Each structure stands twice: as structure tokens, then as C-alpha cells.
Regions:
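FAD-binding core/adjacent interface of flavoenzyme oxidoreductases
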Residues: 1-7, 72-139, 214-216, 238-246
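Beta1-alpha1 glycine-rich phosphate/pyrophosphate-binding loop at the start
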Residues: 4-57, 65, 140-174
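A Rossmann-like FAD-binding core segment of flavoenzymes
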Residues: 37, 63-84, 89-91, 96-97, ...
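Short loop/helix-cap segments at secondary-structure boundaries that form the rim of catalytic
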Residues: 39-40, 114-119, 135-137, 158, ...
Length: 286
């Protein structure tokens, strides 16, 4: 068991890990190479560098630093977080991790496909959170748009109450093929309905009648996890206090998922605060 689990290994996540690990707490960082920092061509406004550095290099240096201190760094996709006596974080390929505190630091980006009707029916049959809205579709037909581990996890959540089909919008991934959940690999044309969603249309002319459409494309962001856990979210940012604590005890957030300014220096500072706050939380809990 890790005492602290950090989801996201960009500057906020790694910064948090430096503080939790140096405080003597077993720390696991889970993330993918799909951070905003990794895509930055040149960074020249960060303290301590006499020459500009590209985002990929700064990212790699952070990972090396975390590993040198003894952090457990896992390259994987987090698909769910559950709270029991401790927090249980499930990944796509490395199983489940348990921790006394969780720090969310995966950013807030969510890819929204350019599908006609998607925006129009948000809140009227289009949802981004299975655990939040599954109840409303009990014994109904629903679709999940997505083509990876996150889409499969959302579909399994819905399967307990509804008749679910995964729509991969193209060639299905192995995760989808092996999930045991019905899927269609047709290209999506639109989501249609009148006052609410009635179905999904495909480019080959076929249609699928459903009452709800759940969007689960790519990997889940901190905002996705926040909504599933009942964390306060305003203006697409997780609400935190001065200690980076959310409204849920033991869950902290740092970086782009809660910051008004998307800068490396802000992410690093918030990560440090979140890490120290997680240490304080666990010590007080024990």
C-alpha cells in the first residue's frame, strides 16, 4: 500500500511527490506521457534555466528526480477511484493501488468529438459521467462513445442498470473487443432527438435508438474523477482551499485542474502545497 497516490505526473504531480516522499511517505505516481507540459516546444519563463528548455525534457527531468527519491512511478491510465476505508485507484493494466490520500493532478482537458448534436443535447441525454447519471437510465438503452479502457470502465458501470453499447467511431481497440460488451465500429454522423436524445445516426445511414449517450473518449481527467467523487467543480475547475484540499477529506488537487493560470510555476507551487497538506492529513489521521 502507498500512503499517497498521485494521479498525473506533470509538474504538479511530481512536485507533490517530492514533498510526500521526502516526508517519509510511500508515494505512487500514476500517469501518461500526454501532459500539456510534454507538448510545450519551449519554456523560457521558469526559474533557474539560463537557456530555454522544451517541455518534454523538463517532464523527463521531473520523472528522473521522483524516481531518484524512491517514488513508485507507473505509466498507466487510471480508470476509476473509489473511497472505502482508504482510497482505491484502479488502472488499465497495473491493477489496483490503495492509499490514505489522493492528489489529483492530471489537468482538465477533455477531448470533445465534433459530432452533430453532442453539445445540443448535453444535460438532455448526453452525459460525461456514468456513475453520476446511470440511475436515470435504468432498464433503458444507452451508448458509450469511446474506444479505450476508460470507455470500457464507463460501459461496465452502466451495464449494471442499462442495455449498453460502445460506439468506437472507427476500428475497435483490443480493450473494447475483449470487454464482452456489445460494440459498433461505425463512424458516427450525429446524435438526434427532439427535446431529448432519441438515438445515434451513423455515416452509413444506420441508426441506433438510445435514451442516453455517455462520452468517454481518451483518458479520464481530474475533472472527470472529481465529478464521480462528488467534488465541487466550478467553471471546469476543481474547487480547493488554500491547502489544495477539496471538499472530500483526503483528496487534494493541484495544477491545471484547479488553477486559473496554466503555468508550470503555478502547477509546481500548488503541487508542493498539496503534497505537504496530504502529509499533514495522514499524520493527523493516524
Amino acid at each position: 500500500m502507498s500512503q499517497v497516490i498521485i494521479i498525473g505526473y506533470g509538474p504538479a504531480g511530481v512536485s507533490a511527490a517530492l514533498y510526500t516522499k521526502r516526508a517519509g511517505f510511500a508515494t505512487t505516481i500514476i500517469g501518461l506521457n500526454k501532459t500539456a507540459l510534454f507538448k510545450a516546444e519551449k519554456i523560457e519563463n521558469y526559474y533557474g534555466f539560463k537557456e530555454p528548455i522544451n517541455g518534454a525534457q523538463l517532464f523527463k527531468e521531473g520523472i528522473v528526480q521522483a524516481k531518484r527519491l524512491g517514488c513508485n512511478v507507473i505509466e498507466d491510465e487510471v480508470i476509476s477511484i473509489a473511497s472505502e476505508s482508504n482510497f482505491k485507484v484502479k488502472t488499465a493494466t497495473n491493477g489496483e493501488f490503495t492509499g490514505a490520500a489522493v492528489i489529483l493532478a492530471t489537468g482538465k482537458q477533455r477531448f470533445t468529438p465534433n459530432i452533430a448534436g453532442l453539445k445540443e443535447f448535453e444535460g438532455r441525454g448526453v452525459s460525461y459521467c456514468a456513475i453520476c447519471d446511470a440511475f436515470f437510465y435504468r432498464n433503458k438503452k444507452v451508448a458509450v462513445i469511446g474506444n479505450g479502457a476508460y470507455a470500457v470502465a464507463e460501459a461496465k458501470e452502466l451495464k449494471a442498470v442499462a442495455d449498453v453499447t460502445i460506439l468506437t467511431n472507427g476500428t475497435a481497440s483490443e480493450e473494447v473487443k475483449l470487454s464482452g460488451i456489445p460494440y459498433l465500429d461505425l463512424e458516427i454522423e450525429n446524435i438526434y432527438g427532439e427535446n431529448k436524445v432519441n438515438g445515434v445516426g451513423f455515416k452509413n445511414g444506420h441508426t441506433l435508438t438510445v435514451s442516453g449517450v455517455f462520452v468517454a473518449i481518451g483518458s479520464a481527467s481530474s475533472i472527470d474523477f472529481a465529478k464521480k467523487l462528488g467534488l465541487f467543480v466550478e467553471n471546469n475547475r476543481i474547487v480547493v482551499d488554500a491547502k489544495q484540499q477539496t471538499n472530500y477529506p483526503g483528496i487534494f488537487a493541484a495544477g491545471d485542474c484547479c488553477a486559473a493560470l496554466s503555468q508550470v510555476c503555478v502547477a509546481v507551487a500548488q503541487g508542493a502545497v498539496a503534497g505537504l497538506s496530504a502529509v499533514e492529513f495522514i499524520r493527523n489521521k493516524n
